[in-house]
């Protein structure tokens, strides 16, 4: 800030200069004087704008107040007139009451009018005079005289300095500076004029300060007293009316009783008269129905079925304008909708849902008919009467067809029906999850409102508070009222109220319970929900510094740990920050980039959490790639759906100038291209279905008693963790959505068979094996049932088993090659087979870190299905798909060891010493490794031998 001079300093310096010009230092303070004037001008300009807005507001209050007074006066006049009418009509008690309220309102109106006038006189007039007087004009007008004096002073001093320097130069000397004392006498006139203008300016500023400060506050004090008088006088008027109001209440009760008695007598008389005229009314009603045959009927007349339900052609439509002209329009009827084209081609056609319309004939014109929609009536005219009848029949037939489809459903929409059934099953299981039987916030029973971005259920009262927080905190949907897509249930299936509150309510104070109950009011709910979700006041905090938070976020995404991710969210980590991943695919990746490039069928909910709770879905890597670019590079349509639902930008280009759509077209990823095209045209449905391993719990209703006795059933409390069965395909052909959906709901469409159908397909979305080579000779055919979880096995204790080396990580990212437009592609190129994968640890839980190193990058290539939700590292394109990582299983009581057993499920060996077999294979038991694993070989194939899990077979009686 430049140096300035205060008023007291200016006065002292000017006095000193006036007494001793040659000894004064005023010449050195002139620049400070100018800085002071400039600063004062800035402040005055700001004050001028604020005072102008204040004046404008006061004026608006005055205008609206006078309008209010006028309306009050009209209301008073109406009360007075109505009371007078009551007095004249033998209702003196009611009339006097209305007149009292008229007088009371008139008194309050007069007081309010006086208050408005006082505000105008006390505040508005002084402000107006100040703005039109001292503060009139624009910025800089007030200091113009000062600026002129400054300019004259500077011109004179520059001229004198130049003359002094030239004089010294003539005498052979060089002068760089001229002291103030040397030119004090020559500059006295200009200096005095400068001081005078500065003094005048400060005087004006002082006056303005008084008027906009002290004087304005004095006026506000006067207005305060006027307000006090208004409220005191109003209170006196209220107190004077109180006794009359109390008496009036008693009188009104008496009058009401008398009127009720009159009403009772009239009702009795009406009933007597009705019973006498009952027969005549029935006959009259029958005649009326005959006369009103052309009126509206709930059941519309049936159309001629010969004309069908679809039609295209031209009709004349009467315009809505003043002229009411007939305009020729192209019309089409199809699938329960009437489409009416406009006269101009660039306008989209109007589309009417016939279920909300009514077709009526026009009695005046035989070739005209009316279509009554919910908001207007369309008048149509056909070429002739026969054409009119055809159009009306088609409209009625199409409406009837749409109505039947709405009530009965369409048998041809198998995929949609499967999605609906799957959604219902998911919602049912979500409601059965631990803690989901009560509201997550207040404990009210049977919550039906879902926060899709947090995966919790709340009651309707708490859901209203969630909506007030905004969608960046909680996105509420109704499980019963809204039509949900499976994508909106991902987090609900994986989090739930119990797991969420274990983190977000970990630090609730026990001595002072703050959590609301079902009977709490909305204020208590709002205070608690705001503290819980916005401030995260009660959440468990594990990390304080930013580096530790980002590291925990990175680990949660790598290990596919949803509760670890929720913990990072509770710690307050920025989900869009660059994560500390030294060996990422591209520099400056975010957690969303990492989640997208390492996603599989079991970890889509990790991506969904990041998509819904990140403030920015368009963060770019060092090479300009967004998460959408990653999806299109790997043909990851499921993640693409989640990002498009979250409104991620599809226009951003990477460093190569390619948008996600450009990449999808170049790599011929048709599904991604179709989704992006839908988003560009605004046709993308946010309630979208996604392919995901839901692992629903279903009852085996159709099993025989023999099957139940014969099988070794897995423990019921472990069914949630059971891995799904799978099968391999010999080619890289993509599977249709209907197949994928049927896989997810196999138990719904196949008489509630056990578990799922095949659940791991060669779909690029989840890392397809794109090798063109056929499967191995021991590839497993599809299984109709799901296998129970594999028991833990310590393979290291077998002396014949050697631990295989770890898999070789790919160092050359396939994505770099995909980023560059290639001249030719050879999908059938053979690849060397890496060493087999390491064995699974003896026991692993879902949320614990995996034993294998998770710091290795997961290449953004079309990869095989990972071994489980926690597994990481790429799989070779030549290797068989592995099932998800099995969960440890409690040992069950087994029968005496037989010699021969039969396989219940398909099983693919994870280790070289294990046996691969298919459902129905007979296995000869050679020995027992432990209680859960036996040794044996396939009957008739002694070369196929190894360890197998007991829970995958059943006994064959000798």
UniProtKB/Swiss-Prot annotation:
Q: Where are the ANK repeats?
A: 587-619, 623-655
Provide the alphabetized UniProt keywords. Answer: ANK repeat, Cell membrane, Coiled coil, Cytoplasm, Golgi apparatus, GTPase activation, Membrane, Metal-binding, Phosphoprotein, Repeat, SH3 domain, Zinc
Ranges where the Arf-GAP domain occurs = 424-546
Recorded superkingdom: Eukaryota
Protein modification: Phosphorylated on tyrosine residues by SRC and PTK2B.
Under the heading SUPFAM superfamilies, the entry gives: Ankyrin repeat (SSF48403), ArfGap/RecO-like zinc finger (SSF57863), BAR/IMD domain-like (SSF103657), PH domain-like (SSF50729), SH3-domain (SSF50044)
Its record classes its membrane topology as:
Peripheral membrane protein
Q: Per UniProt, what does mutating residue 482 to A do?
A: Reduces Arf-GAP mediated stimulation of GTP hydrolysis 1000-fold
Q: Where is this region: Disordered?
A: 283-316, 703-724, 767-900
Q: Which Gene3D superfamilies match?
A: 1.25.40.950, Ankyrin repeat-containing domain, Arf GTPase activating protein, Arfaptin homology (AH) domain/BAR domain, Pleckstrin-homology domain (PH domain)/Phosphotyrosine-binding domain (PTB), SH3 Domains
Compositionally biased, Pro residues: which spans?
833-844
Q: What GO molecular function annotation could you give as one example from this UniProt entry? A: metal ion binding
Q: What effect on the protein does mutating residue 449 to A have, as reported in its record? A: Strongly reduces Arf-GAP mediated stimulation of GTP hydrolysis
Describe the location of the PH domain by residue ranges: 308-400
Q: Its biological function?
A: Activates the small GTPases ARF1, ARF5 and ARF6. Regulates the formation of post-Golgi vesicles and modulates constitutive secretion. Modulates phagocytosis mediated by Fc gamma receptor and ARF6. Modulates PXN recruitment to focal contacts and cell migration.
Report what the protein is called: Arf-GAP with SH3 domain, ANK repeat and PH domain-containing protein 2
Biological source species:
Mus musculus
What is the taxonomic lineage of the source species? Eukaryota, Metazoa, Chordata, Craniata, Vertebrata
Q: Which gene encodes it?
A: Asap2
């Amino acid at each position: 800030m430049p140096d300035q001079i205060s008023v007291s300093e200016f006065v002292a310096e000017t006095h000193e200069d006036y007494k001793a010009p040659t000894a004064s230092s005023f010449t050195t303070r002139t620049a400070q004087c100018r800085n002071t004037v400039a600063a004062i001008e800035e402040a005055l300009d700001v004050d001028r704008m604020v005072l102008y807005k204040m004046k404008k507001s006061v004026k608006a209050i005055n205008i609206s107040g006078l309008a209010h007074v006028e309306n009050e006066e009209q209301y008073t006049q109406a009360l007075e007139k109505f009371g007078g009418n009551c007095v004249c009509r033998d209702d003196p008690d009611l009339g006097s009451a209305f007149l009292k309220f008229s007088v009371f309102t008139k008194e309050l109106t007069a007081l309010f009018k006086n208050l408005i006038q006082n505000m105008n006189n006390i505040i508005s007039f002084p402000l107006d005079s100040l703005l039109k007087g001292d503060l009139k004009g624009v910025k800089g007008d007030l200091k113009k005289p000062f600026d002129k004096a400054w300019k004259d002073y500077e011109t004179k001093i520059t001229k004198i300095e130049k003359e002094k320097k030239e004089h010294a130069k003539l005498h052979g000397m060089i002068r760089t500076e001229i002291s103030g004392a040397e030119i004090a006498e020559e500059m006295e006139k200009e200096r005095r004029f400068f001081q005078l203008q500065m003094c005048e300016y400060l005087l004006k500023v002082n006056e303005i300060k008084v008027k906009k400060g002290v004087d304005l506050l004095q006026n506000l004090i006067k207005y305060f007293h006027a307000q006090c008088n208004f409220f005191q006088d109003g209170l006196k008027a209220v107190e004077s009316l109180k006794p009359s109001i109390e008496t009036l209440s008693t009188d009104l009760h008496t009058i009401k009783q008398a009127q009720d008695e009159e009403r009772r007598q009239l009702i009795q008389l009406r009933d007597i008269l009705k019973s006498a005229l009952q027969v005549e009314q029935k006959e009259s009603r029958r005649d009326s129905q005959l006369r009103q045959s052309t009126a509206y009927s709930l059941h519309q007349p049936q159309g001629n079925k010969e004309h069908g339900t679809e039609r295209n052609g031209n009709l004349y439509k009467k315009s809505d304008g003043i002229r009411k002209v007939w305009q020729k329009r192209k019309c089409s009827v199809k699938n329960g909708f009437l489409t009416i084209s406009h006269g101009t081609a660039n306008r989209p056609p109007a589309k009417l849902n016939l279920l909300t319309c009514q077709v009526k004939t026009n009695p005046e014109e035989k070739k005209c008919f009316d279509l009554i929609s919910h908001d207007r009536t369309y008048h149509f005219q056909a070429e002739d009467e026969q054409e009119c009848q055809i159009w009306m029949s088609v409209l009625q037939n199409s409406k009837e067809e749409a109505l039947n489809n709405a009530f009965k459903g369409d048998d041809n929409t198998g995929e949609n029906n499967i999605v609906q059934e799957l959604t219902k099953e998911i919602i049912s299981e979500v409601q059965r999850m631990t803690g989901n039987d009560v509201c997550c916030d207040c404990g009210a029973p049977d919550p039906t409102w879902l926060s899709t971005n947090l995966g919790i259920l709340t009651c309707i009262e708490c859901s209203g508070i969630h909506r007030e927080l905004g969608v960046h905190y909680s996105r509420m949907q109704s499980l019963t009222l809204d039509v949900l897509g499976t994508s909106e249930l991902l987090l609900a299936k994986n989090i739930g109220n119990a797991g969420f509150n274990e983190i977000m309510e970990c630090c609730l104070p026990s001595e002072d319970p703050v959590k609301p109950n079902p009977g709490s009011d909305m204020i208590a709910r709002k205070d608690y929900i705001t503290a819980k979700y916005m401030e995260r006041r009660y959440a468990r905090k594990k990390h304080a510094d930013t580096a530790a938070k980002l590291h925990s976020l990175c680990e949660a995404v790598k290990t596919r740990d949803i509760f670890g991710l929720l913990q990072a969210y509770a710690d307050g980590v920025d989900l869009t920050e660059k994560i500390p991943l030294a060996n990422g695919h591209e520099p400056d990746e975010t957690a969303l980039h990492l989640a997208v490039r390492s996603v599989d069928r079991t970890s889509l909910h990790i991506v969904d959490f990041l998509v819904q709770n990140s403030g920015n879905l368009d963060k770019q890597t060092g090479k300009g790639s967004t998460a959408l670019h990653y999806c299109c590079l790997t043909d990851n349509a499921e993640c693409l759906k989640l990002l498009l639902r979250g409104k991620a930008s599809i226009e951003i280009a990477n460093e190569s100038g390619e948008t996600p759509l450009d990449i999808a077209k170049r790599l011929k990823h048709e599904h991604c291209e179709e989704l992006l095209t839908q988003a560009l045209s605004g046709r993308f449905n946010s309630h979208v279905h996604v392919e995901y391993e839901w692992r629903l719990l279903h009852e085996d209703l159709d099993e025989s008693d023999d099957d139940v006795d014969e099988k070794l059933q897995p423990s019921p409390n472990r069914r949630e963790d059971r891995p799904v069965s799978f099968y391999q395909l010999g080619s890289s052909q993509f599977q249709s959505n209907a197949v994928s959906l049927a896989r997810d709901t196999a138990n719904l469409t196949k008489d509630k068979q056990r578990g799922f159908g095949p659940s791991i397909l060669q779909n690029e979305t989840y890392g397809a094996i794109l090798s063109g080579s056929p499967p191995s000779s021991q590839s497993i055919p599809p299984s109709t049932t799901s296998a129970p979880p594999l028991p833990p096995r310590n393979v290291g204790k077998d002396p014949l088993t050697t631990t295989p080396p770890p898999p070789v990580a790919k160092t050359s990212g396939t994505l770099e090659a995909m980023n560059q437009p290639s001249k030719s592609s050879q999908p059938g190129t053979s690849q060397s087979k890496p060493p087999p994968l390491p064995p699974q640890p003896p026991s692993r839980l879902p949320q614990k870190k995996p034993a294998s190193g998770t710091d290795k990058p997961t290449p953004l290539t079309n990869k095989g299905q990972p071994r489980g939700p926690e597994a990481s590292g790429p799989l070779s394109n030549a290797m068989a798909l592995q099932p998800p990582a099995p969960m440890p299983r409690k040992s069950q009581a087994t029968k005496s060891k037989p010699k021969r057993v039969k396989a219940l499920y398909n099983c693919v060996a994870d280790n070289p010493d294990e046996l691969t077999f298919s459902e129905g294979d007979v296995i000869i038991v050679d020995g027992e490794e432990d209680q859960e694993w036996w040794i044996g070989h396939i009957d008739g194939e002694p070369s196929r031998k190894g360890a197998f899990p007991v829970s995958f077979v059943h006994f064959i009686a000798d």
